[in-house]
Amino acid sequence: MPYLTAHVLDRVNEWFVRARLSGRMSSHCGTSMVEHMKGLGEAIHPSPQILGGFEPEQVSKLLWKTSSPWPGADGNNKTWYAERFVPRSRTSSSDFDQTLAAGGKEHSPALILLHGWLIDRPQLPIYRSWARHAARRGIEVWMPFLPFHMQRSEPGEISGQRALSPNLSGNLDMVRQGVAEARLLARWLRGRTSRVGIWGMSLGGLVAALTTTLDDDWDAVALWAPVAEPDEVLFNSGLVEFLREAVIQSGVSKDDFAAPEIASMMPNRSDTKIDPSKMLVVAGDYDQVVSPGSVERLSRRWGIEVHWVRHGHISLMLSRAPVRYTANFLEHTLFA
């Protein structure tokens, strides 16, 4: 895609985000994120075993839900939702249920697909098309909604409105919750399927990347435009300019993100536990949200080659070729 087209799409998205969130963003900056993380100690990323029960139940043909065991989750955010896409080789969800009842293992590997910030109903078809690309290759796909998104937002709120705000401590807690829930789902799936992979876009890429720094049993990992350096997005991206102004006025600087207490929330300051051969990173040469430089630094630290495409942040999501490339990688890796 030509640079100008990709650039314009990202700029239009910036305007659209500002318009949607205008007057909705709280100016409350909360407690110091460094002190907040310091107070958590070793509980920054609690293990699935510590968090306890997680048993999704089917509520419709596509939708599943369960109660999130995340401490402090309340309101609509207390309920975890996911859409499940049946592999092409299977014809009905009843087959899946009967297999579980028999205590057997699914022959199809599973994939957790994590969306980006501010996903709403008009964007759902995009992510669903990605899921179906993988499902057509015999992969069972689960697409959970991240905290404060879709059904997990409160009445009158924009989907994802509370996921990113001047309250940086709250933002980090949202990411921590997303990481914990992805690990809980993976643990649940590993008792039922042969292999489990994860694919995340942007914010979802941040969550997916962090799970690989905690668990070594992911069988395939695909990171699309992952937020490898959250501080770089906050202080450099035009997408969150309105948020940056409030954060700077509160006295927060980029130096605060260099604190050791924040390292476990920053992919570029953590090490993955996954073999590079099982990982794919896809990024756009023209991305105005997640800079190519931050992705390149992540690839060097983790020893992963980046599949660069001539796209920006938004045009990457709309392009079919990277989806096919990623689905082929996942099929090859999960069925290896």
Residue ranges and their predicted role:
Residues L210-D255, W308:
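Hydrolase active-site cap/lid region
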Residues L118-H133, V141-R176:
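Cap/lid segment of the alpha/beta-hydrolase catalytic domain
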Residues G312-V323:
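Catalytic histidine-centered segment of alpha/beta-hydrolase-like enzymes
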